[in-house]
């Protein structure tokens, strides 16, 4: 046993690693990397791209404000994540091409992305308005979180993108051939592709204790208004999200293999596109109800196991004691049944991939899509 090694078997540490670039233990190749990079510095000096007399004139004093509409930033959500152009400003000021930058709490590896981007003429010009100090910096990034490494390794790694495109498109085609019907509706006898669906919860009236549709009572669709206070259709009492409870019903969960109290959701709107154009479908017809029933039966037959969220069930985060997490105990609770069928099928296809580098990139593609697939999805242009 050596200092810095995680507690675990050697085989497990090796399986978690991607040597020589990433190791789940002190990296024995680190000194070799640094020695090679130091040699490269000499070549850069001969080419006039760096100076042995480089001096920093003073601290970086400008205000930094970077927009977050950046593909690197938006690919995955991660706390403390910073757009890489913000980091580039510091690197271009404090370092020169070939310098080695170390980030020991790297998170998703945006320091590494910034170090590479310092060699991108377009990005440097957008930041500095001139080409001075342009050139790649070398980055050593480290983080304890496996999810952070998963993101960082792809953002800072080299992959065969042609191979990835072919495989990812093949997976999508295969899944759509099998489950494309989930995202199809019928409009005036014409097949249409579902862009998104709106589902509504049910509310328990604080006065008569009867349950009713939140959408039907709170939403004025014609005027694009969602009322903060809405009336119970049965007794006329005023209700609101602050004072009224959500309706829960006992369901058998086929994935958890147990009866559970869960929110019943009702389809209220379908946004679609067809040959005739785009539109909204407010009244579901029999083909929609048949499709929903087919989704239910397909979901019941899924061959997958339940995974407790963070291994804690509902006792996660800072607000679970208020009951906010009620009904969100397992990972599959975060998905509608329709989307979970698709997510499960795509993941099964990725798991079949034997090329480990390609599999890593496919998993990156898969995890990057989750923010648009689970119930926490929101409007984010």
Each model region followed by its residue ranges:
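Nucleic-acid modification enzymes, centered on SAM-dependent nucleic-acid methyltransferases
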Residues: 1-104, 114-381
């Amino acid at each position: 046993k050596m200092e810095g090694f995680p507690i675990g078997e050697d085989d497990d540490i090796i399986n978690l690693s991607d040597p020589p670039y990433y190791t789940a233990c002190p990296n024995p190749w680190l000194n070799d990397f640094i020695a090679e990079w130091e040699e490269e510095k000499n070549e850069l000096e001969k080419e006039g791209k760096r100076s042995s007399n480089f001096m920093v004139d003073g601290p970086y004093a400008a205000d930094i404000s970077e927009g977050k509409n950046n593909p690197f930033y938006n690919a995955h959500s991660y706390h403390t994540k910073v757009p890489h152009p913000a980091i580039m400003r510091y690197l271009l000021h404090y370092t020169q091409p070939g310098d080695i930058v170390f980030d020991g709490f790297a998170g998703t590896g945006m320091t590494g992305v910034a170090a590479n981007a310092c060699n991108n003429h377009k990005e440097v010009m957008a930041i500095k308005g001139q080409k001075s100090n342009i050139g790649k910096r070398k980055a050593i990034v480290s983080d304890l979180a496996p999810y952070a490494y998963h993101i960082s390794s792809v953002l800072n790694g080299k992959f065969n993108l042609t191979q990835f495109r072919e495989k990812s498109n093949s997976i999508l085609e295969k899944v759509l051939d099998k489950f494309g019907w989930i995202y199809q509706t019928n409009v005036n006898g014409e097949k249409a592709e579902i862009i998104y669906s709106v589902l509504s919860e049910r509310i328990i009236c604080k006065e008569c204790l009867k349950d009713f549709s939140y959408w039907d009572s709170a939403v004025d669709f014609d005027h694009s208004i969602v009322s903060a206070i809405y009336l119970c259709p049965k007794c006329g009492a005023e209700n609101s999200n602050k004072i009224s409870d959500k309706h829960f019903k006992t369901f058998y969960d086929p994935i958890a293999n147990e009866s559970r109290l869960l929110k019943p959701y009702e389809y209220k709107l379908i946004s679609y596109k067809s040959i005739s154009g785009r539109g909204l479908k407010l009244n579901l017809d029999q083909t929609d109800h048949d499709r929903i029933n087919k989704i239910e039966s397909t979901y019941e037959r899924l061959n997958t196991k339940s995974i407790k969220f963070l291994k804690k069930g509902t006792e996660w985060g800072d607000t679970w004691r208020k009951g906010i997490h009620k009904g969100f105990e397992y990972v599959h609770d975060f998905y509608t049944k329709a989307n979970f069928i698709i997510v499960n099928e795509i993941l099964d296809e990725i798991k079949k991939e034997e090329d480990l580098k390609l599999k890593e990139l496919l998993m990156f593609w898969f995890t990057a899509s989750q923010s648009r697939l689970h119930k926490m999805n929101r409007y984010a242009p």
